[in-house]
Design a protein with these regions (language model features):
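Short, flexible helix/strand-to-coil boundary loops that buttress conserved ligand/catalytic motifs
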Residues: 15-18, 52, 97, 137
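Conserved beta-strand scaffold positions in the cores of enzyme catalytic domains, especially
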Residues: 38, 82-84, 140
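Helix N-cap/beta->alpha junction signal
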Residues: 41-42, 86, 129
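Acidic, PIN/NYN-like endoribonuclease modules and their adjacent C-terminal/linker elements
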Residues: 3, 115-148
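A generic structural signal for short hydrophobic patches within well-formed alpha-helices
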Residues: 11, 45-48, 90, 133
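Active-site neighborhoods of divalent-metal-dependent phosphate/nucleic-acid chemistry enzymes
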Residues: 2-3, 50-55, 76-126
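Short, well-structured N-terminal submotif of metal-dependent ribonuclease cores
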Residues: 1-43, 54-73, 147-148
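Acidic active-site catalytic centers that drive phospho-/nucleotidyl reactions
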Residues: 7-9, 47, 111, 129
């Protein structure tokens, strides 16, 4: 497996609750999907569900329903390109997170798991938060780097 692993914040750029969506980046991403692999992680699914449930808990049920529908579209679109945290990715995530913590960083388990999945599958993480992933020493790119 080679290609790109989209971080949750990149997928969130296209959520129906966002006011501004980046059409140029969406076009770039669509082109990548035809020529190389573009993947999501199960961690991203978790984070989106968590976000929807927190909206619901705060009484923002209409917004939560939009996020639910968005999630269903994502899961259909990326159906066989949603990568799980299997045992090998879990081991890699643990190693990467421990190395980052030992170096004085506090990356968080979700980002460590995304990095572990990316490392396990030799993918480049596309993220808006490069800083969150730099301690993991995995290939990264930002939408801002990709487009002028």
């Amino acid at each position: 497996v080679t290609g790109l692993l989209l971080d949750t914040n990149v997928i969130s750029m296209f959520a129906p609750t966002k006011v501004v969506q980046n059409k140029a980046f969406a076009d770039w991403l669509e082109e990548r999907e035809t020529h190389e692999g573009v993947f999501l992680s199960a961690v991203t699914i978790h984070e989106i569900v968590k976000g929807a449930e927190l909206l619901r808990a705060r009484g923002a049920t209409a917004k939560a329903k939009l996020v639910d529908a968005f999630l269903q579209e994502l899961m259909t679109h990326y159906e066989d390109r949603i990568l799980a945290l299997d045992a090998e990715a879990g081991v890699e995530a643990g190693r990467l997170e421990a190395k980052a913590v030992a170096a004085g960083s506090a990356p968080g388990a979700a980002d460590a798991m995304i990095a572990g999945i990316a490392s396990r599958h030799a993918l480049t993480i596309v993220t808006l938060n490069l800083k969150h992933f730099q301690a993991f020493d995995v290939p990264l790119m930002s939408p801002e780097e990709i487009l002028p």
